[in-house]
From Swiss-Prot:
<feature type="repeat" description="ANK 5">
    <location>
        <begin position="176"/>
        <end position="209"/>
    </location>
</feature>
<feature type="repeat" description="ANK 9">
    <location>
        <begin position="320"/>
        <end position="353"/>
    </location>
</feature>
<dbReference type="InterPro" id="IPR002110">
    <property type="entry name" value="Ankyrin_rpt"/>
</dbReference>
<feature type="repeat" description="ANK 6">
    <location>
        <begin position="213"/>
        <end position="246"/>
    </location>
</feature>
<feature type="repeat" description="ANK 4">
    <location>
        <begin position="139"/>
        <end position="172"/>
    </location>
</feature>
<dbReference type="Pfam" id="PF12796">
    <property type="entry name" value="Ank_2"/>
</dbReference>
<feature type="repeat" description="ANK 11">
    <location>
        <begin position="390"/>
        <end position="419"/>
    </location>
</feature>
<feature type="repeat" description="ANK 3">
    <location>
        <begin position="102"/>
        <end position="135"/>
    </location>
</feature>
<feature type="repeat" description="ANK 7">
    <location>
        <begin position="250"/>
        <end position="283"/>
    </location>
</feature>
<protein>
    <recommendedName>
        <fullName>Putative ankyrin repeat protein L93</fullName>
    </recommendedName>
</protein>
<feature type="repeat" description="ANK 10">
    <location>
        <begin position="357"/>
        <end position="386"/>
    </location>
</feature>
<feature type="repeat" description="ANK 8">
    <location>
        <begin position="287"/>
        <end position="316"/>
    </location>
</feature>
<dbReference type="InterPro" id="IPR036770">
    <property type="entry name" value="Ankyrin_rpt-contain_sf"/>
</dbReference>
<feature type="repeat" description="ANK 2">
    <location>
        <begin position="65"/>
        <end position="98"/>
    </location>
</feature>
<keyword id="KW-0677">Repeat</keyword>
<dbReference type="Pfam" id="PF13637">
    <property type="entry name" value="Ank_4"/>
</dbReference>
<feature type="repeat" description="ANK 1">
    <location>
        <begin position="24"/>
        <end position="56"/>
    </location>
</feature>
Length: 421
C-alpha cells in the first residue's frame, strides 16, 4: 500500500515504491494506480475510470518524470496495484514504446524489475503488445542489458532467456561500447551471476568483443575480479578461449591489469591463470610498460616474484628508458618497496643503467628521498658519482630537492662534492 496524501493535481507523488523522490504532473489515473491496494475495490475504481472515453484519451499522458500510467503499473503490479490493471491499460490503448525522461521504456522497467514483479509474464505481455525489444535509453542500454546486469538481483535469468528467445540483439552496444555480455562479466559476483555469463556465451556473444576503450570481457573481469566480478568468471572466459594478449587503445593487456590491481585477494592466482593460458609476459603497453613494471609501481611483491619466476625481463625498458628497478625506486615510499628493490637486485637488475635522460635508480631514489632505498643501492655498489646527460650526479639531485638526510648519507659514502655538471 502506498502511503500518500489525497489526490491533488498540484501535488507530487512517488512513481515507484523504491523511489525516494516524488514527481509532479500525476494524472488521476496514475494516482489511482499507486493507491489501488489502499482500497478493497481499487481495481474496480480504475476500471470505472477508464470506462469513460474522455479518461482513455489521456491514458498515455506523461508526468514530470516522463512516466506513464503503464510504466507505474508495470513496476508496481506486485505492491501497489495488480496485474489486472496492467492488462486493462494495454487493452485500453496504453502505448508500450513511450520513453521516460531518461529514455527508458516500459519494457526496460519490466525487464529490470522482473524478480520484484514476481515473474516474466509482464515482460512477455509487453512483447506481445509489440514493445520494441532493442530500443536504447540515453546511456545506450537495452532491455537485455538491464536484465543481464541485474539477473541476480532485481531481474532474473529467466528474463534474459525470454528476451533472447524473442530475438533481442545480443551484440548491441551501449554508449561505452559495452554489450550485455561485458556487463554480466563485470557484475558476475554481485547483481549478475556466472550463469548469465554462460548463457550469453552459449547464445553467441563474441568473447573477444571490444568496448570503446578496446577492453574485452576478460580485461573487465580482471580489473573487477575482487569487487563486482570474480575469479570464476576469469576461469570461464579463459576456458572458453578468451584471447589473453589483446591490447586496448593504450596498449594494456589483461595481464597488465591483473598486475596493476594485484594488491587484492586472488590476484596471484589470476596472474598464474593468465600466464598459463599464454599471456605475453614481456609485451609493453603504449608507453612500453611491461607487467613487471606495473607490479613494481603498485608494489605487489608476490606478483613480482611470480613474474620473475616466469622469466619476466627484469631489465626491459619503456619508451623513455625506465626499468622496473627505477620504478621501484621512484615509488619507494610504499609498503614492501625496500624488499622489492632488494628482490630485483638479487635477480639481476642492472643497478647502473640509465633511462633516456641518463638517470639511474640511485638518482630516482635521491630525488624521491627514500633513505632506506639509497642505503640499499649504495650497499649493492650503485655508482655514487654517475652522471646523467646533463652531468648531474645523485648528490646534485639531493641538493636540488633539499633532502638533507640524503645529502649527509651521500657525503658519508664519499660522493664527489666538487663534481661539476
Amino acid at each position: 500500500m502506498a502511503s500518500v496524501e489525497p489526490y491533488n493535481s498540484a501535488n507530487e507523488y512517488p512513481c515507484y515504491q523504491e523511489d525516494k523522490n516524488k514527481c509532479g504532473g500525476f494524472t488521476r489515473l496514475m494516482y489511482m494506480i499507486i493507491t489501488e491496494k489502499n482500497h478493497k475495490n481499487g481495481y474496480k475504481m480504475i476500471y470505472s475510470h477508464l470506462s469513460n472515453k474522455k479518461n482513455v484519451k489521456t491514458i498515455n499522458r506523461q508526468n514530470n518524470c516522463g512516466c506513464t500510467a503503464l510504466m507505474i503499473a508495470v513496476t508496481e503490479c506486485k505492491h501497489w496495484c495488480s496485474r489486472k490493471t496492467v492488462n486493462l491499460l494495454l487493452s485500453k490503448g496504453a502505448k508500450v514504446n513511450l520513453m521516460k525522461n531518461e529514455k527508458q521504456t516500459v519494457l526496460m522497467l519490466a525487464s529490470l524489475n522482473s524478480r520484484q514483479i514476481g515473474s516474466t509474464d509482464i515482460v512477455k505481455l509487453l512483447l506481445d503488445y509489440d514493445a520494441k525489444i532493442d530500443i536504447s535509453d540515453e546511456d545506450g542500454w537495452t532491455a537485455l542489458m538491464y536484465a543481464s546486469i541485474n539477473s541476480n538481483e532485481s531481474s532474473t535469468i529467466a528474463t534474459v532467456k525470454l528476451l533472447l528467445n524473442r530475438d533481442a540483439d545480443i551484440n548491441k552496444k551501449d554508449n561505452q561500447g559495452k554489450n550485455s555480455f561485458m556487463w554480466a562479466c563485470q557484475y558476475s559476483n554481485t547483481t549478475s551471476n556466472i550463469k548469465t555469463v554462460k548463457l550469453l556465451l552459449n547464445r553467441g556473444s563474441n568473447i573477444d568483443e571490444l568496448d570503446n576503450n578496446g577492453w574485452t570481457a576478460l580485461m573487465i573481469a580482471c580489473k573487477y575480479a575482487n569487487t563486482t566480478s570474480n575469479i570464476k568468471t576469469i576461469k570461464l572466459l579463459l576456458d572458453r578461449g578468451a584471447d589473453t594478449n589483446i591490447k586496448d587503445k593504450i596498449g594494456l593487456t589483461a595481464l597488465m591489469l591483473a598486475c596493476k590491481y594485484a594488491n587484492t585477494p586472488n590476484s596471484i592466482e589470476i596472474i598464474k591463470l593468465l600466464l598459463d593460458k599464454g599471456a605475453d609476459i614481456n609485451t609493453g603497453n603504449g608507453e612500453g610498460w611491461t607487467a613487471l613494471m606495473f607490479a613494481c609501481k603498485y608494489a605487489n611483491i608476490e606478483a613480482i616474484k611470480l613474474l620473475l619466476d616466469k622469466n619476466a625481463d627484469i631489465n626491459a625498458k619503456d619508451k623513455i628508458g625506465l626499468t622496473a628497478l627505477m620504478l621501484a625506486c621512484k615509488y619507494a615510499n610504499t609498503p614492501n618497496s625496500i624488499e622489492i628493490i632488494k628482490l630485483l637486485l638479487d635477480k639481476g637488475a642492472d643497478i647502473n643503467t640509465g633511462n633516456g635522460e641518463g638517470w639511474t635508480a640511485l638518482m630516482f631514489a635521491c630525488k624521491y628521498a627514500n633513505i632506506e632505498a639509497i642505503k640499499l643501492l649504495l650497499d649493492k655498489n650503485a655508482d655514487i658519482n654517475a652522471k646523467d646527460k646533463d652531468g648531474w650526479t645523485p648528490l646534485m639531485f639531493a641538493c636540488v630537492y633539499a633532502n638533507i638526510e640524503t645529502i649527509k648519507l651521500l657525503l658519508d659514502k664519499r660522493a664527489d662534492i666538487n663534481e661539476i655538471s
